[in-house]
Amino acid sequence: MSGFSLSDLESIVAERSTASPEQSWTAKLVAAGQPKAAKKLGEEAIEAVMAAVTGDRDNLTYEAADVLYHLLVVLKIAEIPLENVMAELERRTAQSGLKEKAGRQSS
């Protein structure tokens, strides 16, 4: 198991977001703004879905990494720390998924 974490990736995204857009894909995405970054996240998510549906495990692993990276870029632009997402996941896992979903539908 790797010692690399999503928190590590979040730190790398934050660091690279301040680099020159000519020298960093992360900085280029951040400079392009949320619409571009969100579109790229969507494209990567579709590629991950396609890999899952076709049963291509290696490609799914590759695309899942792209999804996580691009999600962290989108969160960076929105100024939402990964910690907030993890807190939301923790809140949701404190109850069953069906109960949590029902609670969202009645809100």
Swiss-Prot record:
Superkingdom: Bacteria
This protein's GO CC annotations: cytoplasm
Pathway noted in the entry: Amino-acid biosynthesis; L-histidine biosynthesis; L-histidine from 5-phospho-alpha-D-ribose 1-diphosphate: step 2/9
Compartments (UniProt record): Cytoplasm
Keywords for the protein's UniProt record, in alphabetical order: Amino-acid biosynthesis, ATP-binding, Cytoplasm, Histidine biosynthesis, Hydrolase, Nucleotide-binding
Pfam families: PRA-PH (PF01503)
CDD domains assigned to the protein according to its UniProt record, in alphabetical order: NTP-PPase_HisIE_like
The keyword Transcription regulation is assigned to this record: no
EC numbers for this chain: 3.6.1.31
A molecular function (GO) term: phosphoribosyl-ATP diphosphatase activity
Catalytic activity: 1-(5-phospho-beta-D-ribosyl)-ATP + H2O = 1-(5-phospho-beta-D-ribosyl)-5'-AMP + diphosphate + H(+)
Keyword Hydrolase attached: yes
Record-level GO BP terms: L-histidine biosynthetic process
Family statement drawn from the similarity comment of this UniProt entry: Belongs to the PRA-PH family.
Protein name: Phosphoribosyl-ATP pyrophosphatase
Organism: Rhizobium leguminosarum bv. trifolii (strain WSM2304)
Gene: hisE
